[in-house]
């Protein structure tokens, strides 16, 4: 469906290394600023244990997980909104993202340069945020001038847009990121048309050392993120990359040794999925079991359209079994026998984990 999560941050904080670990790629990750110029794009499979449980029952020939598009974006520097560094290109790339994973360096290492010469995660996070705010201020100010020229026409749509823009500008002037949750549904629809950088759903990835020496810096970043209600996921990106290249058996042994249930990378992928407002439904048959990605609160026809537009256009009904019922009843036949298979129409809101078979006619 093309939902994109951008990896952003200052140069040399671990963005490209994280991208490599998540996508199992080998793009350059060098010890100098702007190693990444053009954004790198990769698909990341969503780890989902439910697929294995479904396959234990169905024994399908193929298993296809859901995926997330990750984009490694060039490092930002102070003054990017005025064109410094790769500023204009960087900001343009961010505008295309649906959510942001903001990597912040929290570890000391004299062998890895820092663009500002010292480790200060709050300062670094604020640099990125300020550049997004400054870019949005320019966008909003131009839009306000355009609206003001039309105010005399008493156009209701223009007036509503002007009022929202003034509200947004006041927040930006105070150095605040735009929290779209603070607006009603109609206002959000208008705001989305502005493509504001500072309104992108964001979480922080704290790149820490593996010896506990990053604790102070990490705590400062968490305290800073809590103010705006953002999540911080701490991890040693270097170690995560080492885990990512292990085969399945070696990875399992390593995680057991480290007393970890799963790689932290999985949490990062799920957080991106969550921020994008996505969920999964399944189709299951002898040829393939597949996880499909849809927006939260999608109707059954919307969900069918992800498979093929004909499915949505000619939608008749959906045969739905919840994941829990499918497993407890040992598949479709058992679910039918126990009355757990439901016929749903066009108004049905698909739930995460639903196992669905669509009926359509075109």
Give the role of each language-model region:
Residues 57, 100-103, 131, 143, ...:
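Amphipathic, soluble alpha-helical interaction motifs
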Residues 1-113, 122, 141, 147:
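Conserved G1/Walker A P-loop phosphate-binding module
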Residues 2-8, 13, 19, 146-349, ...:
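C-terminal-of-GTPase-core extension/linker across diverse P-loop GTPases
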């Amino acid at each position: 469906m093309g939902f994109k999560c951008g990896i952003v941050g200052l140069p040399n904080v671990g963005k490209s290394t994280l991208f490599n670990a998540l996508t199992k790629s080998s793009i350059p990750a060098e010890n100098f600023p702007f190693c990444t110029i053009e954004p790198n794009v990769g698909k990341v499979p969503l780890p989902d244990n439910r697929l294995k449980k479904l396959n234990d029952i169905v024994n399908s020939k193929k298993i296809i997980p859901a995926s997330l598009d990750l984009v490694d974006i060039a490092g930002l520097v102070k003054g990017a909104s005025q064109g410094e560094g790769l500023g204009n290109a960087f900001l343009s790339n961010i505008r295309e993202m649906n959510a942001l994973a903001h990597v912040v360096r929290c570890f000391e290492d004299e062998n890895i340069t820092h663009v500002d010469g010292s480790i200060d995660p709050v300062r670094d996070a604020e640099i990125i945020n300020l550049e997004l705010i400054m870019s949005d201020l320019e966008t909003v100010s131009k839009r306000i001038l355009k609206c003001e020229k039309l105010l005399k026409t008493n156009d209701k749509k223009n007036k509503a847009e002007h009022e929202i823009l003034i509200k947004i500008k006041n927040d930006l002037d105070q150095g605040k990121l735009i929290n779209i949750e603070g607006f009603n549904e109609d206002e959000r629809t208008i705001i989305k048309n502005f493509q504001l950088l500072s309104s992108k759903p964001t979480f922080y990835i704290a790149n820490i050392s593996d010896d506990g020496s990053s604790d102070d810096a990490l705590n400062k970043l968490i305290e800073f993120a809590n103010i705006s209600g953002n999540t911080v996921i701490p991890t040693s990106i270097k170690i995560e990359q080492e885990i990512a290249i292990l085969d399945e058996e070696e990875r399992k042994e390593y995680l057991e040794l480290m007393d970890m249930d799963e790689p932290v990378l999985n949490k990062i992928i799920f957080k991106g999925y969550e921020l994008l407002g996505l969920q999964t439904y399944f189709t299951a048959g002898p040829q393939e079991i597949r996880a499909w990605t849809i927006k939260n609160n999608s109707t059954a026809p919307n969900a069918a359209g992800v498979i093929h537009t004909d499915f949505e256009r000619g939608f008749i009904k959906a045969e739905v079994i919840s994941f829990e019922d499918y497993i407890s009843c040992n598949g479709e036949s058992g679910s039918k026998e126990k009355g757990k298979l439901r016929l749903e129409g066009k108004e049905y809101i698909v739930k995460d984990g639903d196992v669905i078979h669509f009926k359509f006619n075109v």
